[in-house]
């Protein structure tokens, strides 16, 4: 009992120190937000319509960037699908260098993959048809399923901008 009486003040001071160091009251920690773009001082960051809507509007005003059912409970290949989606996005933005104006949307239906994006009209139609065939053929070979591109063209990248923040 004597031992506990001597130990109690030491434990109390340790608890007080730990409780003080665990709470952050700085303004830096309060400004952290996920899924929203931070406003710049000059308000020169362009946002598309899809980027301007916050994440809680998915299903109301905006949609998912990847449509697949393999990430559901007891699905066969959730991790492979996510890695394939990242690869497809990087491949499309690299192949269509500086031409993709929006986010790449991937839709998986049964055995087919449909890829949608907005492309700038900065190249000739002949080159555009070549890039469409090149992208579809290589992705079909690598993914072992039919891949189709659903592209829409815009005259300028500024046509896609919804607002500046």
UniProtKB/Swiss-Prot annotation:
Residues 1-30 form a transit peptide. One of its GO terms (cellular component) is mitochondrial small ribosomal subunit. GO terms for biological process: mitochondrial translation. One of its GO terms (molecular function) is structural constituent of ribosome. Keywords: Mitochondrion, Ribonucleoprotein, Ribosomal protein, Transit peptide. It comes from the Eukaryota. It is found in: Mitochondrion. Its main location: mitochondrion. Belongs to the universal ribosomal protein uS3 family. Component of the mitochondrial ribosome small subunit (28S) which comprises a 12S rRNA and about 30 distinct proteins. This is Small ribosomal subunit protein uS3m. It comes from Drosophila melanogaster. The lineage of its organism: Eukaryota, Metazoa, Ecdysozoa, Arthropoda, Hexapoda. The gene is mRpS24.
């Amino acid at each position: 009992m004597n031992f506990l009486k001597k130990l109690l003040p030491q434990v109390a001071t340790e608890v007080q120190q730990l409780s003080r160091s665990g709470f952050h009251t700085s303004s830096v920690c309060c400004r952290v937000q996920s899924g929203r773009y931070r406003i710049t001082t000059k308000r020169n960051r362009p946002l598309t319509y899809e980027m301007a809507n916050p994440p809680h509007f998915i299903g109301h005003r905006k949609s998912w960037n990847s449509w697949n059912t393999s990430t559901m409970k007891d699905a066969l290949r959730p991790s492979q699908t996510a890695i394939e989606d990242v690869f497809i996005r990087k491949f499309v933005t690299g192949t269509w260098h500086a031409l993709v104006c929006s986010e790449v949307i991937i839709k998986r239906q049964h055995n087919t993959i449909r890829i949608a994006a907005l492309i700038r009209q900065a190249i000739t139609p002949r080159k555009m048809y070549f890039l469409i065939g090149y992208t579809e053929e290589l992705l079909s070979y690598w993914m072992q399923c039919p891949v189709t591109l659903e592209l829409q063209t815009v005259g300028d990248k500024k046509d896609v901008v919804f607002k500046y923040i």
